[in-house]
Amino acid sequence: MKIQILCFTTLFLAIVTSQVTTAYKFKFDYFGNGTDLISFHGDAEYGPDTDGMSRSGAIALTRDNIPYSHGRAILTTPITFKPNASALYPFKTSFTFSITPKTNPNQGHGLAFIVVPSNQNDAGSGLGYLSLLNRTNNGNPNNHLFAVEFDVFQDKSLGDMNDNHVGIDINSVDSVVSVKSGYWVMTRNGWLFKELKLSSGDRYKAWIEYNNNYKVISVTIGFAHLKKPNRPLIEAKFDLSKVIHEQMYTGFAGSMGRGVERHEIWDWTFQN
């Protein structure tokens, strides 16, 4: 399937209900003190600091000492994405992440933001499946999976374009759209693309938005300490109302192969 490319120390959680809409808005500034609002599956955990004793303030989706480690961190409460069976609320999310290889050159595999029908990890496996799906269910339209992957290993059997890309996944880890990781800046001569190495260990910020009127998914990434780039990395037209149920769970998933790599989420906001 292809789609058209359109060229908490502090935790705040609010649920606003009216006859017209149900809105969810939350913000995790960091995850150092833990919270029962996040459920962990597989090898995911509150990340250890470099001393191995204290917490880093991040969610770790994989563990350094477990080969082929993979896991999910999911919000325990489902989010209402639809007021009825057909319509879909617009939504936007942003988060800071880092991918840090511990062995070279065998890094892998990556992490993803996910919207899934269950807060369990019974369908996910490691390696290129990123703890999203597995060999058996990959591509099944009944998965009702929406994900944005940040992939650092080229798995040609799964259609990966290179070892440093961002992709939109619909019911499959074979991305419907994928592009080289990076961001756009405006110069005197027009737009200039600058590549970002996802597995550099640097902290990057990702912004993911869905416009329900135009059925457009946009993905933007940049350095965490800089403002959001004005031009999205990806703008793709797809009707997510056919994928997302009225209530879904959201969170993150990640995996690695033989190469040891740390996949961490440092903060997270969501609003619909």
Q: Where would I find each of the regions flagged by the language model?
A:
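Polar, low-complexity loop segments and adjacent catalytic/binding residues used for recognizing
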Residues: 2-272
